[in-house]
């Protein structure tokens, strides 16, 4: 049989256990109350959270893919432009630019259209102005 001190210890351990469980439950509910939302579109339901400019797991799946494509697209365009403009180191700048503009005229229509779509309004104007100044395009 249990004496009085053992009963007190048993009751104290049970109350401590229930208090700990209550604290854990309160913690879980407070975490669940704060719904995670996408930093871009604000959605709270997604099959996968992706990293973005705000931090890891801050974007929903769709926004994360879109963000990654934007970042990749810019770097690939820069690489292509660097490769096409670097050509030969001993040529003059004007000759390499003229060659690039001539290549632009020779390329297929679809690739030229894609390139124009990627360029902004100011970039298109700059390319046309350079083409006019080198005489490869007539007004």
Swiss-Prot record:
Pfam annotation, one family: GATA
One term of GO molecular function: DNA-binding transcription factor activity
Keyword Cytoplasm among UniProt keywords: no
Residue ranges, annotated region (Disordered): 67-98
GO CC field: nucleus
Keyword vocabulary terms for this entry: DNA-binding, Metal-binding, Nucleus, Transcription, Transcription regulation, Zinc, Zinc-finger
Membrane-spanning parts: none
PANTHER family hit by this protein: GATA TRANSCRIPTION FACTOR 16 (PTHR47172:SF18), OS01G0976800 PROTEIN (PTHR47172)
Function: Transcriptional regulator that specifically binds 5'-GATA-3' or 5'-GAT-3' motifs within gene promoters.
Protein name, entry field: GATA transcription factor 16
Organism: Arabidopsis thaliana (Mouse-ear cress)
């Amino acid at each position: 049989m249990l004496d009085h001190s053992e009963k007190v210890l048993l009751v104290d351990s049970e109350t401590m256990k229930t208090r700990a469980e209550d604290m854990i439950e309160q913690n879980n509910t407070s975490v669940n109350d704060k719904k995670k939302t996408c930093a871009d579109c604000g959605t709270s339901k997604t099959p996968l959270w992706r990293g973005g400019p705000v931090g890891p797991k801050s974007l929903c799946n769709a926004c994360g893919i879109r963000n990654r494509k934007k970042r990749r697209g810019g770097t690939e365009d820069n690489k292509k432009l660097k490769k096409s403009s670097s050509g030969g180191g001993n040529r003059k700048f004007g000759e390499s630019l003229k060659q690039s503009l001539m290549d632009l005229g020779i390329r297929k229509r679809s690739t030229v259209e894609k390139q124009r779509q990627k360029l902004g309004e100011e970039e298109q104007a700059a390319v046309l102005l350079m083409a006019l100044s080198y005489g490869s395009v007539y007004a």
